[in-house]
Amino acid sequence: AALAGCNSDSDNDDAVVEPPAAVTPDSINLSFLGRYSAGIFAESAAEIPAFDPVNKRIFIVNAQKGAVDVLDATDAANPTLIDTLTAADVAADAVVNSIAYKGGYLAVAIEASPKTDNGFVALYDATTLELLGSAQVGAQPDMLTFSPDGQYLLTANEGEPNNDYSVDPVGSISILSLTDDEIVEVRTATFSSFNARRDELIQAGVRIFGPNASVEQDLEPEYIAISEDSTTA
């Protein structure tokens, strides 16, 4: 950002000149720089990345392992594996679904075993890789993101049913309040208020088709976007 000022004899000293609106480019150009190979083909061994610009590290969800691979990208042309974070310290037989990085912290979304049980979010120090804390959220947290101001961490809890639909958890969004390096509060928003409008929603084109499923059971959130002022998601 740049600021400029000058003296003025005008009576309209309070006038504000709006900066030009940012223009989103129609395309971007990408140039190959380097590659890390997990050595596993077609098994989702490199699924979701997050970059730590301070330590020059790349965190990657390795869905084949159900863990997070940590790469040293100091030499960007030749990133190397230096560590792997598992969910074992949080829950037995749990697997990692997603990650997010912000301000020196790595957040990890963890799916419980079975996946229909409530999952977890874990917070790590991105430098030491120390587990700072964890909290229980809704079933099958499938994506998570920090708010722009860093005060909140939100997870989209997909809540998929098991194979025979004998257990069908509700979809939900969990909102974790953060203070420094601690998770201090967890609130979970469900879609239960829409259950009474099931027929209305179906007529409007909303797909609700699970066997005997309520609206909140059939809605399976996968992604979250947050406003720049961190007030709306």
Model-inferred region functions:
Residues F51-N55, Y101-G104, F146-G150, S227-S230:
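Residue-level detector of Asp-centered blade-edge/turn motifs that repeat once per structural unit
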Residues N29-F41, D83-A92, T179-L219:
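Surface-exposed loop and turn segments in beta-propeller and other repeat-based domains
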Residues G119-L129, D168-D180:
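Beta-propeller blade signature
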Residues A109-D117, A156-S172:
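Short, conserved, GDST-rich strand-edge loop motifs in beta-rich repeat architectures
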Residues D75-S113, G138:
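Blade-loop segments of beta-propeller domains
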Residues A2-S27:
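Bacterial Sec-dependent N-terminal signal peptides
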